Amino acid sequence: MVAGLEPTTSGRILIGGKDMTGARPRSRDVAMVFQSYALYPNMTVAQNMAFALENAKVDRATITERVGWAAKMLQLTDLLERKPAALSGGQRQRVAMGRAIVRKPTVFCMDEPLSNLDAKLRVSMRGEIAALQRDLGVTTVYVTHDQVEAMTMGHRVAVMKEGVLQQVATPTELYNHPVNTFVAGFIGSPAISLFDCPVTEEGVHLGSLLLPLPHQVAAQVGKHVCIGVRPEGWDLVGEGEGLRMQTDLVEVLGSQNYLHAKPTSELRTGSRVAVMIDRHTRPASGEPVWIRPNEQVLFFDPEDGTAL
């Protein structure tokens, strides 16, 4: 809809403060970068990058200047005479981006541009795109199913579920203050652990533990509340001081480890719980551990999943 390729059923699309809802695609000054590179196999890198400008009847001197400028920015200068078949996946994606950059558009729309790359290349290209957007200063709408890409690249992130907008906020706001359990579960890796807990005047009952009753949960006394605990929201404690768990595996990530443990029946959940632990801690598989939530606990309505 932003590019004008799909009809807008309601609302307005403003680009640079101008209402472009009914404008033709070529009038919107939006450049697209697709999941598939969509490069012309019979053209060189330079010809692919220049194609849109040639169609727009831009003069040759300007085309040469812009292609050279974009190629230098994307480290493609030495590859301008090659054809797509002679390029790596990362190089092809750079060419696709260069084709959009030379237009000097008002808005970039990038539709999962890194999904066809291997894991290592995705990480490096993620940084390159973020740096490129910073240097160009062009508004960029970036579509992705990868929450790591969204969190590391976005200044503001819009989370959607089945076409319905759930929350628009900064990555930090999404992580710390999700509006519902869907957003809480989508943002963060390993995923947040969710538990259905009864609430009494004494507090919130998480298995054998009694957690303090926060003000936003006071109305739930006599009912249940859904609590969410992220991996860093757990503390390892001494025997008998927390929930008894059975170590399933330890995920080693260098500077830190993630303990994945099976909960006991008192938690009424079959899913594993992920706990962030320091790199020197590595309990063996099957070894019992005791964990307790710290102050980083989120509370949700158990009926509709909205944050309390």
Regions found by a protein language model. Name each.
Residues 3:
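Helix-to-loop junction immediately C-terminal to a conserved catalytic motif
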Residues 6-7, 14, 54:
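A position-specific signal in ABC ATPase nucleotide-binding domains
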Residues 11-19:
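Conserved ABC transporter NBD signature motif
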Residues 22-182:
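ABC ATPase nucleotide-binding domains
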Residues 171-201:
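ABC transporter nucleotide-binding domain
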Residues 190-194, 199-308:
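Non-catalytic connector elements of ABC transporters
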